[in-house]
Amino acid sequence: MMLIPTHHFRDIERKPEYLQPEKCAPPPFPGPAGAMWFIRDGCGIACAIVTWFLVLYAEFVVLFVMLVPSRDYAYSIINGIVFNLLAFLALASHCRAMLTDPGAVPKGNATKEFIESLQLKPGQVVYKCPKCCSIKPDRAHHCSVCKRCIRKMDHHCPWVNNCVGENNQKYFVLFTMYIALISLHALIMVGFHFLHCFEEDWTKCSSFSPPTTVILLILLCFEALLFLIFTSVMFGTQVHSICTDETGIEQLKKEERRWAKKTKWMNMKAVFGHPFSLGWASPFATPDQGKADPYQYVV
């Protein structure tokens, strides 16, 4: 007897009650193009506010405790420009990482009509997420906080109140890089300022009282050291993940590699855009990644 090839529809959690595409409601009407993405999560919003507060605190101490009272105008101007530029780029990267759709799969598109429109060939399957009722592209994972399946999801970061995925990984990498740079810059300036205050009169090295100055500088030093270590490790982890073309979740789950292997340079260009330019370091440049839309899997 000859068997007729059939298409396959698989549920990611292998629950029989979810295997019927008719169980899904029709997908919601798409929102306007360019609509802002924002996750309403209390913990994430609180972490994002704390992030901005800490950067603005560092800005306050650097400007009004160290640079403004300094008699070396060249030192104050140069360091003020560098620190403010890095802080601006860090906060801009934070906003882009937080407000950019990380690559959410259309919700509720696992309908019978949509599956038939894919025109699957024999031997091909599609995977469905029972939680958001979406057809999962290859390398997509469901986020319990965003309540969506995210393409190439690396992890959900509460500090940016968003998932780090296919569309916003560049901005997250820039955010960690610029935070690490301003943390290092702040530590260096705190060290020089302490030396200056020890050599000079404490009452002349700051517009604040000596005890207040010491407390503000120690708090900034602790904050800068903590975030320098944290963001440097995160930056290195992200760059390694990009170069190996393997997300944090894929590494954690030890998922079998089903995608084509590319060079490290090609993987970097896939995240930061083609070709290499100063736009790689800009949170305002949107990378042209030329992404595909792979809903189908060959098994």
Curated annotation (Swiss-Prot):
GO terms for cellular component: Golgi apparatus; Golgi membrane. The DHHC domain is required for palmitoyltransferase activity. The active site is at C157. Monomer. Homooligomers. The monomeric form has a higher catalytic activity. Forms heterooligomers with ZDHHC7. Interacts with TNFRSF10A. It comes from the Eukaryota. One of its GO terms (molecular function) is protein-cysteine S-palmitoyltransferase activity. Changing C129S: No effect on ZDHHC3 palmitoylation. Changed protein structure. Decreased protein-cysteine S-palmitoyltransferase activity. Disruption phenotype: Homozygous knockout mice are viable, fertile and do not display overt phenotype. Male show a modest reduction in body weight. Zdhhc3 and Zdhhc7 double knockout mice show a perinatally lethal phenotype. PANTHER family: PALMITOYLTRANSFERASE ZDHHC16. This is Palmitoyltransferase ZDHHC3. Widely expressed, with highest levels in brain. In the brain, expressed only in neurons (at protein level). The chain crosses the membrane at residues 48-68, 73-93, 172-192, 215-235. The gene is Zdhhc3. It comes from Mus musculus (Mouse). Keywords: Acyltransferase, Golgi apparatus, Lipoprotein, Membrane, Palmitate, Phosphoprotein, Transferase, Transmembrane, Transmembrane helix. Phosphorylation by FGFR1 and SRC probably regulates the palmitoyltransferase activity. It catalyses: L-cysteinyl-[protein] + hexadecanoyl-CoA = S-hexadecanoyl-L-cysteinyl-[protein] + CoA; L-cysteinyl-[protein] + tetradecanoyl-CoA = S-tetradecanoyl-L-cysteinyl-[protein] + CoA; L-cysteinyl-[protein] + octadecanoyl-CoA = S-octadecanoyl-L-cysteinyl-[protein] + CoA. InterPro entries: Palmitoyltrfase_DHHC, PFA4/ZDH16/20/ERF2-like. It is a multi-pass membrane protein. One of its GO terms (biological process) is protein palmitoylation.
